[in-house]
Amino acid sequence: MRLFLNLDAMKHLFAYKLTTLVLVILAIASVAARAQETSNGANAESAEEITNFDDIFAEETSTNESAPAEQSAAKSGSSGVTVLDEMGIEGEGINEAAPVDKKTKAESVKVMDATELQGSSTTIADATNRSSGVKIRQSGGMGSESKINIRGMEGKNVKVLVDGVPVDNGNGNFSVNDIPIDKIDRIEIYKSYVPERFATDGMGGVINIVTHDLPKSSITGSYSFGSFNTHKASLDAKYVWVTDSAKSRAIATGISAYYNYSDNDYEFTTPYMDTVVSRDHDRYYSYNVLPYVSFEKYFFDKATLGVVYNAMDKEIQSNSHRIEEANANAQSYGVNLSLEKANLFVKGLSAALSFSYAFCKEAVIDTSHTYYYGWDKENVREANTAFGEISMGGASHIERENQTIVAPWNFDYAFTQNPILTWSGLYRYESQDPKDKRAAKGQTLNSAGFPGHSHSVVTGLSLENNFWNERIQNVAGVKGYYYSIKADDDGEKRIQQLTDDYAENKDFGYSENLRVKLIDNLSVVEQFAVKGGYQHSLRFPTREEIFGDGMYVQCSPNLKPEKSDNFTAGAELDMRQIPLLLKLHLEFNWFYMLMEDRIYWNNYASVPRPYYNSVGTKTAGFEIDAAVDVNEYISLSYNLTRQEAESREADLAYGIAKGLTVPNIPTLYMNFGAEFHVGDLIYRDDFFKLYWLANYTDEYYYSWKVSKRQDRTIPSSFTQDLGVEYSILANMLSWNFEVRNFMDVRVYDKYGESKPGRAFATKIKFTL
């Protein structure tokens, strides 16, 4: 089935891009006109006259005058204590952003309510993986590398945020499962679109994890135990002193902490072996402690100061051969200050400012004298000196000290008549000082990479408009990018030397999203709406991509950012009280993405090579979502994603022909769900839930698809989960038991690596 349209020409039409940019500028310029309109409307309002065309269709409502400003302040995205480091993060959402209601937003966004999952044993990756257009693939169990794929784009092109602030380490790998689901209010999934208010680069989309705050003095915690000796615990405690009830002033102090542990000793297989083995030497643990204090209504609506300590330790295991000694560890310290104020100086202007600093020290130690060629212990090579296990002859003891400064800001101006103008930005500084301890002793060449630092600033301006009682919604925006990267030649001996030590670039992007509600509350049709969007976006190259690692990757100072033009269109229908069904939601979305200057590195080359801007790709596909409330007790859900990504041009130097299917990207997958729930079953305010979840992923290729007869494919799979949950005392005490992959189906992930089979987990959660 072919999904591609001949839109290459469209992308290259200067008139099309120019028209889009003009529309964005005109939309933002309309702010002044709307402000004048607001002033005139205020005078006419006293005479009870209709002076605005929107008023003809507006419903009469009674609202607090300060509501727009307060909502705008709550919506600003970078609040909360968030520590960023190279190996792990945790966020305490001191102020949560206003919920994004997908039905009243023109943006391409899916919002998942995590509060319904807080009593379950599920993880953030599991929950996100159930959304259409999203695939999260892991190379193992807890603590393993995660690759997030949104509509065919993955890794560095997909950004992970916590409370609106980027937290991944820039290489596309991030262990989202370290964050307990109990700390999450909701998960916002932006597909083929990176909102200007987030002030970050990226092209494939954004996963914004919004944390929640305890509403009052309370303690909440959870503990879960599962297969492979997996333990998870979390604790949140908060105490509030009301210092001036008349002015609503208060001081709150609290602590947030979590702990994760797993042996990851599951059975697995890979294309490199013809037998099933029990995985060992793959233990992982991490913990995080975050105390904070906040001041409410002391000029700022909220001022929060927090500090954090985070640690991780992981045994390293390979999928191709046995490893028995190599390991990695990291420790980080951080501090964060955030300030929030509604109606700052003028009514309707809200601000959220934040500053965070983190210091992280990490190490990868591989100094074994033994190398195993396979998983048995018979085919082995031993040496008198350190030989290394990760790669034969590549012994190393690398330590890195990283420093990160992040300063996001967000200003919203909410006009009386409804437009919201948002100016957001994020400054980020990163430095890295890598050391190779074996090279320092003269035992080998330095393989730790080059020290250096980087500065980046991303700023966005967006205008949100709602017309005719939200029958028409529009969000338009522009975004500016700047980054500079510096590498230092420390004089250490390396295989590869720097050919340049500085890189700088700047660019801009823009977007336009429109939603039109064609039917609103007509008989059994609650609403029917259509929408469309376009964004021109880019991704910065990383420091390693530009300067190399001194070993296997050469310097490439002229590397350009990746760019993409993303087109989306969709329709959604909500119905109620139809025969045999209580509610029905149907949604269809189409997407088409044209990517150019794709950054590529040939990891199969026998000699060191640089990253370079290779052929672009084009991705097309569609999604179908359906949700049904059969009655007040039974609900069903289903979604399907179909997508194809192909090379747009030939790159004969690396054997890539035009029209080849991009490898290692699923092309067809579906999710199914069924739930039975009932309240007041045994006691008043109790709740019982029984659920079934399933996923089907079709076969796809893990190398460039040259022929349908090639056998380098990842087999199709169908997995099923079962769970039961029971809570009492209005959810103050809950218990959950879940069986994942209860049919014990062998499931393969990226590059043919098998995932853990059947697994059990049980969890207890309490609130005091």
Pin down the residues of each PLM region:
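Gram-negative outer-membrane beta-barrel transporters
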Residues: 468-473, 481-483, 585, 589-594, ...
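Short acidic/polar hinge/loop motifs at secondary-structure boundaries
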Residues: 165-192
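Membrane-embedded beta-barrel scaffold of Gram-negative outer-membrane proteins
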Residues: 530-535, 562-620, 641
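Periplasmic-side early beta-strands and strand-to-turn transitions of outer-membrane beta-barrels
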Residues: 216, 224, 240-326
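N-terminal periplasmic "start-of-domain" segments of outer-membrane beta-barrel proteins
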Residues: 41, 53, 65, 69, ...
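Short strand-turn segments of transmembrane beta-barrel domains in outer membranes
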Residues: 188, 196, 206, 212-241, ...
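Conserved C-terminal beta-signal and adjacent last beta-strands/turns
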Residues: 22, 283-289, 294-296, 310, ...
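Face-selective signature of the C-terminal outer-membrane beta-barrel domain
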Residues: 293-311, 330-527, 533-535, 579-590, ...
